[in-house]
């Protein structure tokens, strides 16, 4: 028995494949979280425009080929990174009376972020399911991703009391020429255009 056969007897190849797939998935979850956190740097006062395509293309590529549950987790991780850092300022209100409410600051931000992250997770699931079941051209895939993302942002801004903070379009606030389309399509329409253009590099990389 050669060494390879002996190794296969001790460690089954299917087990190794399972471990490799799990590691690959965890890498996508981590990438989703990091990409979401990077979006915070696209908003004022940082306004690093280059990070817009980096963040959204990373999510776009990371969702391809994932099952329903895994796509949800990757999208949720993106939202957790985005809101966990993007709305951390909410904690300041608990420190006004720190002795009474200070201990609630981190749990409150974490809980709200986890809840808001469901919206990008829904967009991620819808996109991943359609992309997995049908052969989408790059342009159509980008349009679908941007559409689902915009719908998720609209829902987040209107469901219950609404929370329309840190929309994708806010990344253009400091760029007068780029934010002009908002006059015709509004902030959500501008979010659609922003995300659509942002995922084009990701689609090109997968071509």
Residue ranges of model-derived segments:
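N-terminal acidic, proline/glycine-rich, low-complexity intrinsically disordered segments
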Residues: 1-5
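Membrane-embedded alpha-helical bundles of multi-pass enzymes
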Residues: 7-207
């Amino acid at each position: 028995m050669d060494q390879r056969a002996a190794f296969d007897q001790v460690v089954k190849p299917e087990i190794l494949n399972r471990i490799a797939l799990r590691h690959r998935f965890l890498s996508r979850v981590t990438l989703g979280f990091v990409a979401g956190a990077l979006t915070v740097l696209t908003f004022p006062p940082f306004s690093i425009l280059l990070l817009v395509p980096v963040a959204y293309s990373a999510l776009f590529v990371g969702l391809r080929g994932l099952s329903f549950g895994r796509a949800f987790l990757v999208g949720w991780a993106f939202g957790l990174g985005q809101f966990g850092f993007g709305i951390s300022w909410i904690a300041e209100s608990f420190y006004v009376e720190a002795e009474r409410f200070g201990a609630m600051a981190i749990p409150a931000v974490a809980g709200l972020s986890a809840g808001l992250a469901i919206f990008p997770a829904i967009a991620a699931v819808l996109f991943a399911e359609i992309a997995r079941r049908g052969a989408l051209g790059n342009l159509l895939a980008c349009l679908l991703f941007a559409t689902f993302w915009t719908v998720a942002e609209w829902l987040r801004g209107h469901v219950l009391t609404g929370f329309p903070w840190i929309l994708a379009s806010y990344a253009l606030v400091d760029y007068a020429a780029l934010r002009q389309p908002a006059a015709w399509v509004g902030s959500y329409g501008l979010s659609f255009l922003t995300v659509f253009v942002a995922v084009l590099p990701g689609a090109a990389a997968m071509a």
